[in-house]
UniProtKB/Swiss-Prot annotation:
One of its GO terms (biological process) is nuclear-transcribed mRNA catabolic process, nonsense-mediated decay. The gene is pnrc2. Residues 58-72 have a biased composition (Low complexity). Residues 13-22 have a biased composition (Polar residues). It holds the Pfam family PNRC. Keywords: Activator, Cytoplasm, Nonsense-mediated mRNA decay, Nucleus, Transcription, Transcription regulation. Involved in nonsense-mediated mRNA decay (NMD) by acting as a bridge between the mRNA decapping complex and the NMD machinery. May act by targeting the NMD machinery to the P-body and recruiting the decapping machinery to aberrant mRNAs. Required for upf1/rent1 localization to the P-body. Also acts as a nuclear receptor coactivator. Residues 1-22, 58-78 are annotated as: Disordered. The keyword Transcription regulation applies. InterPro entries: PNRC-like_rgn, PNRC1/2. Belongs to the PNRC family. PNRC2 subfamily. A motif (SH3-binding) lies at residues 96-102. This is Proline-rich nuclear receptor coactivator 2.
Length: 136
């Protein structure tokens, strides 16, 4: 009834070892290809690009402090950025103002008892409006 005994079969281990060796060889080949392609790019002239030269010159020169000071001069002042947006007309709803009572939805009929008098309905609508902070 048991699952039986497991036996070590030497043939399976050889297959796994072969797969591992093949994977290692593939990884080594890929690494060699990457290294040779990088060196070929440098020979072709990618290493002599303006960006590469600028980066090398930046490392050699100590002018980085002056470039950092000039960096902030290229951006507009934050005051101007926010005041320009305030002057624009915004056509959306203003949430600081309460909605008009005519816009408010009416409660479903099954929420309201059928035996309500008009005075009770007015009282309920008043309570609903005060809950919604609407001026009556």
């Amino acid at each position: 009834m048991g699952g039986g005994e497991r036996f070590n079969i030497p043939g399976q281990h050889r297959n796994n070892l072969g797969k591992q060796i093949n994977r290692q060889k593939l990884l080594e080949r890929n690494n060699q290809k990457m290294n040779t392609s990088l060196s070929k790019d440098r020979v072709r002239g990618c290493g002599t690009s303006l960006a590469w030269q600028a980066m090398q010159n930046g490392v050699n020169n100590n002018n980085t402090r002056s470039s950092n000071q000039n960096w902030s001069a290229g951006f507009p002042a934050s005051k101007n950025f926010f005041t320009d947006q305030d002057n624009q007309n915004y056509a959306g709803a203003k949430f600081s103002e309460p909605p008009s009572p005519s816009v408010l939805p009416k409660p479903p009929s099954h929420w309201v008892l059928l035996s309500c008098s008009p005075a009770e309905k007015e009282l309920m609508s008043f309570q609903l409006k005060t809950l919604l902070k609407v001026q009556a």
